[in-house]
C-alpha cells in the first residue's frame, strides 16, 4: 500500500506519518519546507521520542519526501492508495488544487483503484471541508468520476505534539506523548477498509469528535487560560495547581454530562477518560507552553468551538456550567504579544466592554443570563 501525507511538521512526522510507516505502508511526505524535505530524502528515516511514564526513542524508516508544490506531488496522487493531511485547517484550501490535479491525472491514466483521503486536522469533519475545496478546483467532467472512485473520510485525531526544542537541532527529531487516538468514519471509505494499527474505525464519528473537543480541547484551553492568569509557564505547572485543576476537572465533567446525555456514553468510562486526560496534562516530558495552547482565543471562543459549544449543550439539557463559565472568563483575559487574535480580543473588550464583546465573538445573546454570568466571572478575575 502506498500513501502520501501532506504536512511533514511535528504532527505529520510524530503521529500520522509514524502510524502509516509503522504499518509497513510505503510513505511519502509532501511539504513546502525545503530543509525538512532535504533531510528526509537524505536519510529516509527520523527519530520520534515517545514520552509518558517512561521515555523511548522510535525510529521511523523507509520514508521519502516531495515538494507539495510542483508536478511530483500530482504524479503521486495519481498512483497512491491513501492521502492524509496534517497541515492545519487554513492550509487545506491551499493543497486542494494539487489534489484535484492528481485526481484528473488518475482518471486520464485509467487508474480506477480506490483512493481514500483523510484530513487529520483539529477540526470537525475536516475532510468534508477539504472535499468542497477539491470539488471547486476540479473540471466539471471529472467530478462524477471522483465521486465514484475517491473516498473522502472524516476523522478525529488526538495526540499532544509540542514544538520540540531538539538538543541536536535535528530538523526531523520530534517528541510526542504515548497516548494517540485516530478515529475514522468507516462509512465514507471506497473499497476495502484499511487495517492500520492505531487507526480506529467507527460508524458514529461525531460522538468521538465531540468527546475529544469537549474534553481534551476544552480542558487544555481552560488549563492554559487559568494557568496564564496565575503566572504559570507550562500546562503541567498549571494543572498541578489545585485551584486550577478543580475548575478544569469540573468543566470537563460539565461538558461530559452533555456528551453522556447526547450520545449515551457510559458515565464511568467517561470519568476514566477525564482522569486519563488530566494525567496527560501532567506529563513531565511535555514542555507544553500555556501561551502556545491558549493562542487564537477568538477562534476558541466561537460558537462551534471548545468553550461555547459545550456551554450551549448545558443550556440545551438544563445542566450546570459554573466551571465552563470560569474557563470562558479566563479566555477573555488572555493576552499575548505574539498572537494577533489575543490583541484583537483585548481591543474589542476595551472598545465595547466585556458583555458586547463576548456576545459578538461567541454568538451568545448579549442579554442572556449566561453572558451575564461570564461577565461577572471575568470582572472577578481582574
UniProtKB/Swiss-Prot annotation:
GO molecular function: mannitol-1-phosphate 5-dehydrogenase activity
An example Gene Ontology biological process: mannitol catabolic process
Reactions mediated catalytically: D-mannitol 1-phosphate + NAD(+) = beta-D-fructose 6-phosphate + NADH + H(+)
Catalytic activity, EC: 1.1.1.17
PROSITE patterns referenced in this protein's UniProt entry, alphabetically: MANNITOL_DHGENASE
Keyword list, A-Z: Acetylation, NAD, Oxidoreductase
Residues carrying N6-acetyllysine: 269
Pfam family, one: Mannitol_dh_C
Oligomer and partners: Monomer.
UniProt similarity note: Belongs to the mannitol dehydrogenase family.
Alphabetical list of NCBIfam families matching this protein: PRK02318.1-2, PRK02318.1-3, PRK02318.1-4, PRK02318.2-2, PRK02318.2-5
The protein's name in its UniProt record: Mannitol-1-phosphate 5-dehydrogenase
Gene that specifies this protein: mtlD
Amino acid at each position: 500500500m502506498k500513501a502520501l501525507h501532506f504536512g511533514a511538521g511535528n504532527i505529520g512526522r510524530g503521529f500520522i506519518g509514524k502510524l502509516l510507516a509503522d504499518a509497513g505502508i510505503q510513505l511519502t511526505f509532501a511539504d513546502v519546507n525545503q530543509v525538512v524535505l532535504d533531510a528526509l530524502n537524505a536519510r529516509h528515516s527520523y527519530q520520534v521520542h515517545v514520552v509518558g511514564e517512561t521515555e523511548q526513542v522510535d525510529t521511523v524508516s523507509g520514508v521519502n519526501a516531495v515538494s507539495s508544490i510542483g508536478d511530483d506531488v500530482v504524479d503521486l496522487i495519481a498512483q497512491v492508495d491513501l492521502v492524509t493531511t496534517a497541515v492545519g485547517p487554513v492550509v487545506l484550501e491551499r493543497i486542494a488544487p494539487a489534489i484535484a490535479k492528481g485526481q484528473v491525472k488518475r482518471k486520464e491514466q485509467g487508474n480506477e483503484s480506490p483512493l481514500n483521503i483523510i484530513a487529520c486536522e483539529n477540526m470537525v469533519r475536516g475532510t468534508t471541508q477539504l472535499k468542497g475545496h477539491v470539488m471547486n478546483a476540479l473540471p466539471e467532467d471529472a467530478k462524477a468520476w471522483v465521486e465514484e472512485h475517491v473516498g473522502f473520510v472524516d476523522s478525529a485525531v488526538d495526540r499532544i505534539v509540542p514544538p520540540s526544542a531538539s538538543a541536536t537541532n535535528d530538523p526531523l527529531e520530534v517528541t510526542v506523548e504515548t497516548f494517540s487516538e485516530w478515529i475514522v468514519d468507516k462509512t465514507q471509505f471506497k473499497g476495502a477498509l484499511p487495517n492500520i494499527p492505531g487507526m480506529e474505525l467507527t460508524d458514529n464519528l461525531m460522538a468521538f469528535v465531540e468527546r475529544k473537543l469537549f474534553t481534551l480541547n476544552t480542558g487544555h484551553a481552560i488549563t492554559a487560560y487559568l494557568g496564564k492568569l496565575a503566572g504559570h509557564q507550562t500546562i503541567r505547572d498549571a494543572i498541578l495547581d489545585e485551584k486550577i485543576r478543580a475548575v478544569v476537572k469540573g468543566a470537563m465533567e460539565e461538558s461530559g454530562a452533555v456528551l453522556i446525555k447526547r450520545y449515551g456514553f457510559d458515565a464511568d468510562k467517561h470519568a476514566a477518560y477525564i482522569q486519563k486526560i488530566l494525567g496527560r496534562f501532567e506529563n513531565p516530558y511535555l514542555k507544553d507552553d500555556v501561551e502556545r495552547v491558549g493562542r487564537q482565543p477568538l477562534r476558541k471562543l466561537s460558537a462551534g468551538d471548545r468553550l461555547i459549544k459545550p456551554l450551549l449543550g448545558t443550556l440545551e439539557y438544563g445542566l450546570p456550567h459554573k466551571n465552563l463559565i470560569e474557563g470562558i472568563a479566563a479566555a477573555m483575559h488572555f493576552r499575548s504579544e505574539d498572537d494577533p487574535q489575543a490583541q484583537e480580543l483585548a481591543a474589542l473588550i476595551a472598545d465595547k466592554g466585556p458583555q458586547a464583546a463576548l456576545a459578538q465573538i461567541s454568538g451568545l445573546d448579549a442579554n442572556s443570563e449566561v453572558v451575564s454570568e461570564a461577565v461577572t466571572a471575568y470582572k472577578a478575575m481582574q
